[in-house]
């Protein structure tokens, strides 16, 4: 179930972790005086940087842009022993400008009007929690090794007049070409970042938080960093003692890890969840008419001989509606010529459901409207098999309760009055549920356990950065979920449907995937994370069957 209608609010500094995080020079009595002097001078001459970022690979865009710039300014302590980098980047999409800042270890997003013709000073500042594994930054830089040559996706990395390094950050490999005095370039499978040293800092202004707001949390703190890291950040040559101790490795090759279909290729049908007001009699080739209730799986479906998307009204009709269940069955039966219309058996098909779509199919199976042959695989994401507290919460709001938080959550959970579909997802055995709804949940859970081939259930609303991220952050924290393990709308325990949680793992290679993704991420509306295996929904589907 999902109702995302908020403005676009997104970006990522995750690809910039090699340069825009806080660092502290490690100076202690055991170091030589020469090295101490070198560190002091190097930090005193630290440059501001222009970071030109190019995103590559599948589903790699921020606000629709795969190329953008980030500015990073060094902040050096008075004694030249401590340094951190502040950074910012701006994106314009539609009528809104989004500026992302990393200042004094704290992440912010500033939302403002993009048009100069609009006479308004409106802007809003949002705190962003840590979604970058900062604890791995410094080991990555400190452990960088010199390599004689390198390649990415089989293409050689050219580094004329510079030095090549290889390192790994949170399991992701990078090659760095460092040119003294001019900057460096970091190469990865999904990103290339060129850092150019600037003669002076770039100015920016951080808006003040509203008076009643709590201060934004610090998401990273200084940690020791070795001369190798300082040399990469500042463009200086290493001191002789560090140069002698620097390890050298063999050729560095970063190769793409792709998955091929491991089973019989079959047609795939995608059945969306709650919140789409549109209805189409025919299956669609794209999910455009689903009102962002499903994203495009694109070329992440090696086992799909064809891909179709159903477009059904899931605002005025809830998951217990027999007509809606019948449509789910009819569309699924139409995908393969081997399906048996007489026995209503869906054969040789991959059925993919998201959110309330999983409940619709489970209830259709439980009530005998259709059944799945052994040759059919049902893949479920974020199914609220016990309901969602979002429905109960919206009902509280519409009844006049919780008025102080209405503006924060209405874009996420929906509007008053509560829709029929939203009412159908009242939490099982909750104050708004009924005996009939409770019984329907129990029956659907049994069918779910007996038939689902693979499932993605999330333990965190802190997913990948996207336009849906801030609203999901609100949903995960403001909605009174019964568990902190939720994707903003659906709890992990609700998604389990009675399955053993020990079946689930946090790698995209696990058939039952315990992810850290928000509700939009699990609908393929965003993209894979760059670093964590627990944040790769597209890769999970690509490698699943």
Model-found features: residue ranges?
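Glycine-rich His-Gly loop
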Residues: 271-276, 354-355, 383
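N-terminal leader/targeting segments and the immediate start of mature chains
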Residues: 7-10, 16-86, 141, 150, ...
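An acidic-aromatic
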Residues: 69-136
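Gly/Ala-rich beta-loop-alpha elbow adjacent to hydrolase catalytic centers
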Residues: 352-357, 361
């Amino acid at each position: 179930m999902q109702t995302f209608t908020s403005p676009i609010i997104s970006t990522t500094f995750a690809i910039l972790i090699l340069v825009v995080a806080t660092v502290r020079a490690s100076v202690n009595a055991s170091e030589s005086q020469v090295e101490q002097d070198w560190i002091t001078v190097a930090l005193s001459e630290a440059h501001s940087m222009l970071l030109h970022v190019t995103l590559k690979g599948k589903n790699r865009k921020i606000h629709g842009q795969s190329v953008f710039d980030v500015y990073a300014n060094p902040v050096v302590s008075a004694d030249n022993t401590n340094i951190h980098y502040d950074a910012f980047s701006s994106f314009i999409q539609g009528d809104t400008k989004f500026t992302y800042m990393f200042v004094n270890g704290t992440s912010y997003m500033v939302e403002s009007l993009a048009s100069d013709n609009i006479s308004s000073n409106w802007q809003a500042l949002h705190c962003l929690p840590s979604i970058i594994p900062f604890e791995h930054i410094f080991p990555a830089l400190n452990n960088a090794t010199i390599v004689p040559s390198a390649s990415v996706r089989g293409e050689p990395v050219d580094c004329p007049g510079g030095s090549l390094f290889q390192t790994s950050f949170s399991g992701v490999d990078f090659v760095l070409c460092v040119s003294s005095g001019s900057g460096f370039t970091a190469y990865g499978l999904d990103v290339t970042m060129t850092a150019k040293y600037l003669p002076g800092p770039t100015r920016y202004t951080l808006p003040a938080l509203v008076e009643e707001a709590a201060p934004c949390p610090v998401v990273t703190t200084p940690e020791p960093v070795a001369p190798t890291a300082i040399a990469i950040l500042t463009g200086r040559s290493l001191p002789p003692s560090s140069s002698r101790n620097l390890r050298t490795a063999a050729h560095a090759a970063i190769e793409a890890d792709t998955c091929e279909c491991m089973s019989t290729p079959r047609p795939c049908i995608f059945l969306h969840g709650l919140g789409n007001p549109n209805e189409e009699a025919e299956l669609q080739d794209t999910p455009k008419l689903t009102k962002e209730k499903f994203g495009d799986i694109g070329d992440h479906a090696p086992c799909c001989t064809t891909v179709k998307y159903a477009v059904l009204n899931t605002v005025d009709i809830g998951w217990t509606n027999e007509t809606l269940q019948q449509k789910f069955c009819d569309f699924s039966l139409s995908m393969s010529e081997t399906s048996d219309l007489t026995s209503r058996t869906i054969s040789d098909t991959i059925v993919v459901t998201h959110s309330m779509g999983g409940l619709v199919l489970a209830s259709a199976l439980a009530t005998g409207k259709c059944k799945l042959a052994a040759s059919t695989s049902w893949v479920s994401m974020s199914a609220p098999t016990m309901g969602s507290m979002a429905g109960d919460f919206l009902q509280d709001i519409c009844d006049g309760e919780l008025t102080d938080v209405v503006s924060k959550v209405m874009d996420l959970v929906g509007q008053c009055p509560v829709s029929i579909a939203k009412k159908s997802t009242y939490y099982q055995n909750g104050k708004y549920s009924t005996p009939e709804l409770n019984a329907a949940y129990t029956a659907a859970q049994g069918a779910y356990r007996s038939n689902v081939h693979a499932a993605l259930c999330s333990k965190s609303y802190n997913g990948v950065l996207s336009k849906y991220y801030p609203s999901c952050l609100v949903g995960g924290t403001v909605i009174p979920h019964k568990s902190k393990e939720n994707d903003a709308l659906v709890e992990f325990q609700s998604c389990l449907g009675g399955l053993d949680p020990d079946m689930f793992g946090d790698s995209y290679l696990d058939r039952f995937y315990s992810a850290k993704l928000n509700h939009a991420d699990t609908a393929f509306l965003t993209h894979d994370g760059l670093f964590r295996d627990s944040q790769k929904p597209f890769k999970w589907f690509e490698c699943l069957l």
